[in-house]
């Protein structure tokens, strides 16, 4: 019985982390209201978290909760679609390339930074 309660409390704690992270991510996304910087900074945060090898609770809170609601593929792709639909093909292509390249670069750089920081505090 005790282990069943322990498992249930861990699940509730994960749900709590998910809810709080999601709310904070959604509020910040709403306040920034700029798909490009939201997606780039979200990718950078993901890179840092993974590079640091943060604990599972921190990853659950930040990766699934916060970044899951903070970054916004659907809003961004709607902007791309509207540009294509209205004949701004080069702007749409530029938006696609800048977000993909920017997001990949931000994640790669912050992953590397996270690994360096981790090695400073936790030598191998």
From Swiss-Prot:
UniProt superkingdom: Bacteria
UniProt GO MF annotations: fluoride channel activity; metal ion binding
Notes on how activity is controlled: Na(+) is not transported, but it plays an essential structural role and its presence is essential for fluoride channel function.
GO biological process, any: cellular detoxification of fluoride
Binding-site residues for Na(+), renumbered to this chain: 68, 71
Residues in coiled coil: none
Localization annotation: Cell inner membrane
Any single GO CC term annotated in Swiss-Prot or TrEMBL for this entry: plasma membrane
Membrane topology: Multi-pass membrane protein
Recorded family membership: Belongs to the fluoride channel Fluc/FEX (TC 1.A.43) family.
Function (record text): Fluoride-specific ion channel. Important for reducing fluoride concentration in the cell, thus reducing its toxicity.
Name listed for the protein in its UniProt record: Fluoride-specific ion channel FluC 1
Species of provenance: Prochlorococcus marinus (strain SARG / CCMP1375 / SS120)
